[in-house]
Every structure is written in structure tokens, then in C-alpha cells.
């Protein structure tokens, strides 16, 4: 007679074994109707799974985040069901859940078109509307193998052969005539899978290995209700408008081409953005007392082997040979910084030593994963390493955290999620060392009044880590900043300092990044601002336009005054109507549009309007220059009078 304990502490006793669905029905018909699955003693289970011992149970519905994930997974099976009806010859591979949706990898000789995707979605809708029951059957490995062999599902057979023990009992989910294999759980009824949309199709190698066959990956999104689906689609529509690749082309910021995949060709305005961002970080480095250094672009393979990076990163490293020596272009800066630290004897009085670099790094990312500025092969890290004693860890981490928040606030990012990754099973050092390291990070976060989530076991083998994930205006998450303790690399590369007792000690190394990659962060900013950069960051901050040729000399005078005040300004003397000029520079997202006619010239004024169409009226040029200069120095996010 199992006794079921519910989240509110109430208990229900049953005479026979029960399922989550039975318990939900015992509570009430409404809950039974809404029940998707159950969390039994902390483990997700199908609604039909039997509970035969005293257990704690949480009933999962579509209102729960877990419930939405489950229905998304079931939508992947629904996709498979519909796909096999339309293309019976297709072979199904895998169909997992991803952020906001799902996908299915499929082997089909016919290349899917948009018309095919539309037909597939239509068939999915038809099937879902029948509200058919999903039947779970658990049997032997051989039964599962025979089932898929009879259906010619070679990928499912391979998964069974290579990934599932013959002693296991795989779960098969029957969607009418369609059968899929999964750990589950899944929805008990397709009535829960009504609000979805297929989004796109792309190529994907089986098991992510380019030596294997290229499959077709169909992506979809699914939500608990119509409203949530609509909100998500609207957000995607807005994201498409803000796509940094599209805006980058419109504003002539950069381009990429096939001869240099994953490498950025910065154009004048894009490089202006890059340099302004670098200038800002460089000022922060001075504020927080960092040295700025520059290490070589490539180093001998021997050094990468000593640092341990060769074992973990060699496949992602670009290499070259010269005079019988193999060199690797650096994928990160840390080994080079240790080499700089090692030059000359260091005392405990020299610590903490904070070393920063705008390091040009390269990683041989798979071509299919490259995505504009967000995923590149050549990138610049705002990388820094702090060499300190163990007693200094907390104060140094605290300073790093403050620097991260100072930086993000300048760009308007206030929604920041912080996670602390703790000791993994395989690690160096003893528990005392890890206790001290983790406690130092916790105390640094607490001292800065920062809430954080602990990720048990997710730290690196050489030390715990803090991750900073910022959320943009579309509520997308971008993991950018990290503060990572490292108790291994300094020792591997022979870094030491002379302690107060004259003994040789190994320093603790703190890896610190704020933006991560400047290229990626600029991609984030382009989308966050939709190309409307704050004045201090904008490539061109003001453009001065004449109405007739009579004002040409005055336009030159105004531009010179602005430039003398450190304002990036240009002139537009074209023989075009002023309305045409204003529209063109508005599309270029120039913050301030200055118009001069005879009256403005006579009074030494400019007529000012913003790129958003706000008319600021006529202003003395010296006054305007002073206001903009102040706005730039403060790195204000808003334009004048906004």
C-alpha cells in the first residue's frame, strides 16, 4: 500500500500500486486532465509509470517548465510520426529537445523544400488534433532491436548496438503505427501537443562527425498554449530584424567570405566600433590596476603539451611547421601570460600581479557551427590573468566581479544570471583546497550582494568557476564573463614566487574574461541596440548637412568644431533634397543629424534632430558640441532629451 507524499506535505494512501495519473485523478478530474508526467522521488517519470512503494510525488503539468520540455520532446516524436507517413522510406535518427523547441535528424535522399516543411507541419497538426494516446511499452533489448530492424530503422539499430546495454529494457513509445525509442518521459496524450511550428531545415552529420553521412535536421518550436507560441514567434521576428549579420551589411560594418571562413573583414565603421570597445576596456584595466601585455600569436607545440592544452584542444588548434618544429596558433592566452610572469624573480610583495591582453586567438571550429560574429575562428579575447597568493583569492575575485558588473552596466545590461561551478569528480588537489577555493568564491559573491546558482560538479578539474550570463532586450541568454580559479597551470609551467619565509611557492591563477570575445560581444551589441549605438560607441556620431551650396563653408566650420571636441563627425554636401539626406543618415543610424541653412549660418547655430526623429531645435554649435562631448565622456546610453 504505497503512501504518496505531495509537495504540500499532504499524504495519500493507496491500496494498490498506482501511477502518477491515478494520483492526479484521486486529487481531482481537473488535475488528471492536466497531468503530463510526475517527478517521483526527484526523478521524472511517465504519467503511466507504476509507483509501488512509499514515494514523494510532484505532478507535472504544462504550467511547469518541465512539462513544456516534455511536450516539446513529444512534438519531436509527432514530427517523426508525420514524416514517416509522408516519406515512408525515411530513416529516423535522433530527435532531442533544445532551447525553446526540438529537432529531428532524418536520413532522406530527397532534399526537403519549404513546401515539404509546410506539408509536414500540416500533417503534424492533423495528427495532433486526433488527440491520440501515446502508449509506452518497456521490453527487452532484443524486442527493441527486432522492432527497428523490421522497420529498416538503421540509426535506431546502431544506437541500440553501440549505446544501450543488452541487459537494459528500452522504452518504446507507440504513436499509433509509428514507434520511437526514448528514455522519456512523454505526454500521455497528443492533446498536449497542439501549439507548435516548424522553423527550418539544415544539414547535420550523424553523431556530429563529418566522416558520417549528412542528415537533414528539421527544427521546430513548441509551447504550452497559443499565446506563448505567438509571443515566441513575435520575438523571433524581432530577432530577425535585429540580426547582426543583416545590420552589419546595412551599416557596412564588416563582411566574411569563403576564402577565410570564420574570420572577420572589418570595414571602417565596424573597426571604429571595435577600437572604441577596446578603448573602453583598456580604461577599465587602468582603473583596476592591470598591466597590459602582448604575447606571440603562435608557440611551439612543446609548450602546449606542457600546459596540458594539446591533449584537450589539439583538434581545434591551427598548426604549422618550420625547420622541423611544429607550432600552434594560440587558442587562448593563458600559457603565454605564465611565460611573461616567469621572467624575473617574483616576490610575495609583487602579488597580486594582474596581467591583461587583447589576445588574438584562433580555434578551428566546425564550419557548420560558424555564425556571423557570434561563432568565429579568429577572435580577440579581453583576457586577463591574476597571479596571487591563496590568501588574496577572495579580494581579487571580488574585484573581478565588480569589474564585470561595472562593464555590463555601461552597456545597459542589468539582468545578469550568475552560476558557481563546483568541484568535479575528477580533480586535482585535496578537499581542503577545494573547500577554501569554493568558499572564497562564495564569499566574494556574497560581499558583492550577488545571488547565484550552484552547479555541483561543473567546475574544471583545476578549480571552481563563476559564470556571468547576461540577458538582452529579447530575453536571450549570452554567457560572456567568467572568473576561473586555476591551481594547475602555474605549476605545470613552473611559475613560482618567493614567499615571506623565503620558500618557493606556486601562485594561484585567476582567469578573468568580461566580454569573452570582442567580436561576439559586438554581435550582441549590434542586436541589442538594433544598430542604434549609444553616441559614445557610434562609428559616426553626427553628420552635418547643408540646404544649399551657400552653406558649404559653414558646414566645414561646424564639422571642424565637432572634431576639435573629439566628436566623430562628417559632412554631406551633396546636391540632394534635405529630406533625402535626412532619411539616408537616419537609416545609417547616425545619432545626430545637423541641418544648416542661411539662418543657422548667420546665428552660428545648427538645427538638430536625432535619428529617431526628435527635433531638438536650433542650438549654438559650441553648446551642442559641449553637450555631446559630455554625453560621450559619461558613456550615456540615451541621446539628448530622451
Curated annotation (Swiss-Prot):
Location in the cell: Cytoplasm
Annotated keywords: Aminoacyl-tRNA synthetase, ATP-binding, Cytoplasm, Ligase, Metal-binding, Nucleotide-binding, Protein biosynthesis, RNA-binding, tRNA-binding, Zinc
Cysteines joined through disulfide linkages: none
Positions contributing to Zn(2+) binding: 334, 385, 511
Catalytic reaction annotation: tRNA(Thr) + L-threonine + ATP = L-threonyl-tRNA(Thr) + AMP + diphosphate + H(+)
Assembly information from the UniProt record: Homodimer.
GO CC, any one term: cytosol
CDD domains tied to this protein: TGS_ThrRS, ThrRS_anticodon, ThrRS_core
Task of the protein: Catalyzes the attachment of threonine to tRNA(Thr) in a two-step reaction: L-threonine is first activated by ATP to form Thr-AMP and then transferred to the acceptor end of tRNA(Thr). Also edits incorrectly charged L-seryl-tRNA(Thr).
Cofactor requirements of the protein: Zn(2+)
HAMAP family: Thr_tRNA_synth (MF_00184)
Keyword RNA-binding included in the entry's annotation: yes
Listed GO biological process terms: threonyl-tRNA aminoacylation
Enzyme Commission number(s) from the entry: 6.1.1.3
Protein name: Threonine--tRNA ligase
Superkingdom field: Bacteria
Gene3D superfamilies the UniProt entry points to: 3.10.20.30, 3.30.54.20, Anticodon-binding domain (3.40.50.800), Bira Bifunctional Protein, Domain 2 (3.30.930.10), Threonyl-trna Synthetase, Chain A, domain 2 (3.30.980.10)
SMART domains in UniProt: tRNA_SAD (SM00863)
Family per similarity comment: Belongs to the class-II aminoacyl-tRNA synthetase family.
Domain TGS: 1-61
GO molecular function: ATP binding; metal ion binding; threonine-tRNA ligase activity; tRNA binding
Main subcellular location: cytoplasm
Cofactor note: Binds 1 zinc ion per subunit.
Gene transcribed to yield this protein: thrS
Region (Catalytic) location: 243-534
Pfam families, per database record: HGTP_anticodon (PF03129), TGS (PF02824), tRNA-synt_2b (PF00587), tRNA_SAD (PF07973)
Amino acid at each position: 500500500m504505497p503512501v504518496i507524499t505531495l509537495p504540500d506535505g499532504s499524504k495519500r494512501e493507496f491500496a494498490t500500486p498506482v501511477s502518477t495519473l491515478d494520483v492526479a485523478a484521486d486529487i481531482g478530474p481537473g488535475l488528471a486532465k492536466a497531468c503530463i508526467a510526475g517527478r517521483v522521488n526527484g526523478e521524472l517519470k511517465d504519467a503511466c509509470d507504476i509507483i509501488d512503494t512509499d514515494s514523494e510525488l510532484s505532478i507535472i503539468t504544462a504550467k511547469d517548465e518541465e512539462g513544456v520540455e516534455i511536450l516539446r520532446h513529444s512534438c519531436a516524436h509527432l514530427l517523426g510520426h508525420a514524416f514517416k507517413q509522408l516519406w515512408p522510406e525515411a530513416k529516423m535518427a535522433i530527435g532531442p529537445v533544445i532551447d525553446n523547441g526540438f529537432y529531428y535528424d532524418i536520413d532522406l535522399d530527397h532534399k526537403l523544400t519549404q513546401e515539404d516543411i509546410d506539408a509536414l507541419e500540416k500533417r503534424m497538426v492533423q495528427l495532433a488534433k486526433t488527440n491520440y494516446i501515446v502508449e509506452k511499452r518497456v521490453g527487452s533489448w532484443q524486442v527493441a532491436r527486432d522492432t527497428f530492424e523490421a522497420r529498416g530503422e538503421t540509426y535506431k539499430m546502431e544506437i541500440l548496438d553501440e549505446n544501450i546495454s543488452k541487459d537494459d529494457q528500452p522504452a518504446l513509445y507507440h504513436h499509433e503505427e509509428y514507434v520511437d525509442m526514448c528514455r522519456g518521459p512523454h505526454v500521455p496524450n497528443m492533446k498536449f501537443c497542439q501549439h507548435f511550428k516548424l522553423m527550418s531545415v539544415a544539414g547535420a552529420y550523424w553523431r556530429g562527425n563529418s566522416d558520417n553521412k549528412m542528415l537533414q535536421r528539421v527544427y521546430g518550436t513548441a509551447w504550452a498554449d497559443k499565446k506563448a507560441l505567438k509571443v515566441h514567434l513575435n520575438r523571433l521576428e524581432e530577432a530577425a530584424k535585429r540580426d547582426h549579420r543583416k545590420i552589419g551589411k546595412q551599416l557596412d560594418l564588416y563582411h566574411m567570405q569563403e576564402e577565410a571562413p570564420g574570420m572577420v573583414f572589418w570595414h571602417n565603421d565596424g573597426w571604429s566600433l571595435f577600437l572604441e570597445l577596446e578603448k573602453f576596456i583598456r580604461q577599465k584595466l587602468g582603473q583596476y590596476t592591470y598591466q597590459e601585455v602582448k604575447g606571440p600569436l603562435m608557440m611551439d607545440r612543446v609548450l602546449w603539451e606542457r600546459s596540458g592544452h594539446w591533449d584537450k584542444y589539439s583538434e581545434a588548434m591551427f598548426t604549422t611547421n618550420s625547420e622541423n618544429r611544429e607550432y600552434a596558433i594560440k587558442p587562448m592566452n593563458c600559457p603565454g601570460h605564465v611565460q611573461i610572469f616567469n621572467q624575473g624573480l617574483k616576490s610575495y610583495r609583487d602579488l597580486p600581479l594582474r596581467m591583461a591582453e587583447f589576445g588574438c586567438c584562433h580555434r578551428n571550429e566546425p564550419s557548420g557551427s560558424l555564425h556571423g560574429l557570434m561563432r568565429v575562428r579568429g577572435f580577440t579575447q579581453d583576457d586577463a590573468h591574476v597571479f596571487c597568493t591563496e590568501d588574496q583569492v577572495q579580494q581579487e575575485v571580488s574585484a573581478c566581479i565588480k569589474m564585470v558588473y561595472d562593464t555590463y552596466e555601461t552597456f545597459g545590461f542589468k539582468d545578469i544570471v550568475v552560476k558557481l561551478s563546483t568541484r568535479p569528480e575528477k580533480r586535482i588537489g585535496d578537499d581542503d583546497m577545494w573547500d577554501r577555493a569554493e568558499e572564497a568564491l562564495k564569499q566574494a559573491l556574497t560581499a558583492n550582494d550577488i545571488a547565484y546558482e550552484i552547479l555541483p560538479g561543473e567546475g574544471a578539474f583545476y578549480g571552481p568557476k563563476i559564470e556571468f550570463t547576461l540577458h538582452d532586450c529579447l530575453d536571450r541568454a549570452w554567457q560572456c564573463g567568467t572568473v576561473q580559479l586555476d591551481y594547475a597551470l602555474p605549476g605545470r609551467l613552473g611559475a613560482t614566487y618567493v614567499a615571506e619565509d623565503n620558500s618557493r611557492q606556486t601562485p594561484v591563477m585567476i582567469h578573468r574574461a568580461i566580454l569573452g570575445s570582442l567580436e561576439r560581444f559586438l554581435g550582441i551589441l549590434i542586436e541589442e541596440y538594433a544598430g542604434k549605438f549609444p553616441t559614445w560607441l557610434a562609428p559616426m556620431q553626427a553628420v552635418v548637412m547643408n540646404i544649399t551650396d551657400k552653406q558649404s563653408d559653414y558646414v566645414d566650420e561646424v564639422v571642424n568644431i565637432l572634431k576639435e571636441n573629439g566628436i566623430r563627425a562628417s559632412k554631406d554636401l551633396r546636391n540632394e533634397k534635405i529630406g533625402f539626406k535626412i532619411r539616408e543618415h537616419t537609416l545609417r543610424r547616425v545619432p545626430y543629424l545637423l541641418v544648416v541653412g542661411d539662418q543657422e549660418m548667420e546665428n552660428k547655430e545648427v538645427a538638430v534632430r536625432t535619428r529617431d526623429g526628435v527635433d531638438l531645435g536650433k542650438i549654438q554649435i559650441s553648446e551642442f558640441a559641449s553637450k555631446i562631448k559630455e554625453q560621450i565622456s559619461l558613456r550615456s546610453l540615451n541621446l539628448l532629451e530622451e
